[in-house]
Amino acid sequence: MALKHFNPITPGQRQLVIVDRSELYKGKPVKSLTEGLSKKGGRNNTGRITVRFQGGGHKRSYRFIDFKRRKLDVVGTVERLEYDPNRTAFIALIRYTDGELAYILAPQRLAVGDQVVAGNFVDVKPGNAMPLSSMPVGTIIHNVELKPGKGGQIARSAGTYAQLVGRDQGMAILRLNSGEQRLVSGACFASVGAVSNPDHGNINDGKAGRSVWRGKRPHVRGVAMNPVDHPHGGGEGRTSGGRHPVTPWGKPTKGKKTRSNKATDKFIMRSRHQRKK
C-alpha cells in the first residue's frame, strides 16, 4: 500500500503523511472474534499511574488474533484484509474449509482469495505456517514462537521479519531485525513472509492531536518539571539538568544496560550490540 501526502490547506496537513488504507475492508470486524477493551489510562489495579503519558484515545474493540496457527492441514481462504487499531500490522480474516473463522497477521503479498495452510510439510509461501525444522534455510519469516505451542512472539510489528540462517542440533538459528542471531527450538512454528504495512515507519502524524487519538498524551521532559517531580527538575531559567541523564526514579538512562535475564543468554549467538561487520 502506498503513502498519502496532502496539500497544506491546514497546518496539521502540511507535514501529514499516512498509509493509504483504501484497499482494506471498510466494515466492522467479526463480532465473535472481538471483545470489549476498557481504557486503563496507564493505571494499575490500585489506580496508580504505572505508565506515564497514556490516556484518552478513540474507543477500540480487541480482535482475537491466532498467533499459534495450530489448525493443521486445514486450508483457509483469505476473506478480507482489515485494519486493526491495536497493532501496526494489518490482519487477514481466514475462512477454513470446515467453516471456522480466524484472524491472522497479514503478511506482505497476501491478497483476498489466497489460500493459506498450517502444517508440518506445506508450501513455502506467504501466510503459511510450519515448524522451523521444516523450512528451507534462508526463508523470510514472521510471528515466530520462542516456545513450542506458546504462540508467535517475534516479528509481529508492521514490516518486520526474521530470517532462518541455519540449523544446529535440533535448534534453528534466526537473524532478527535488530541484527541479533538467536537459537530457537526447531519445533517452534513460524509463518512465512514479512509482516504487512512496511510503510508504517514512513508516516508523519502532522499534528499532536493524532497521537492523542491513539491514547498518547504529551511526553514531558524532566528538565521542564519541578524538583518534586523529577531529578532534572528546577533551576533558575532553562537548565541542562546538571547531572547524567536519569529516570524519574533516579536510575541511569540513555545507554545504561538493563538486561538481567541470564537464563536466555545461551540462546543468543550474536548480540544486537556487536559491531556490524
UniProtKB/Swiss-Prot annotation:
Annotated GO biological process: cytoplasmic translation
Pfam family of the protein (one): Ribosomal_L2
GO molecular function, one term: transferase activity
Gene3D superfamilies found in the cross-reference section: 2.30.30.30, Nucleic acid-binding proteins, Ribosomal protein L2, domain 3
Entry keyword RNA-binding: yes
Keyword set, alphabetical order: Ribonucleoprotein, Ribosomal protein, RNA-binding, rRNA-binding
SUPFAM superfamilies in the cross-refs: Nucleic acid-binding proteins (SSF50249), Translation proteins SH3-like domain (SSF50104)
Keyword Transport: no
UniProt region (Disordered), positions on chain: 222-277
Gene Ontology cellular-component terms listed: large ribosomal subunit
Quaternary assembly: Part of the 50S ribosomal subunit. Forms a bridge to the 30S subunit in the 70S ribosome.
Family affiliation: Belongs to the universal ribosomal protein uL2 family.
Biological role: One of the primary rRNA binding proteins. Required for association of the 30S and 50S subunits to form the 70S ribosome, for tRNA binding and peptide bond formation. It has been suggested to have peptidyltransferase activity; this is somewhat controversial. Makes several contacts with the 16S rRNA in the 70S ribosome.
HAMAP family on file: Ribosomal_uL2_B
Name of the protein: Large ribosomal subunit protein uL2
Source taxonomy: Bacteria, Pseudomonadati, Pseudomonadota, Alphaproteobacteria, Hyphomicrobiales
Gene that this sequence comes from: rplB
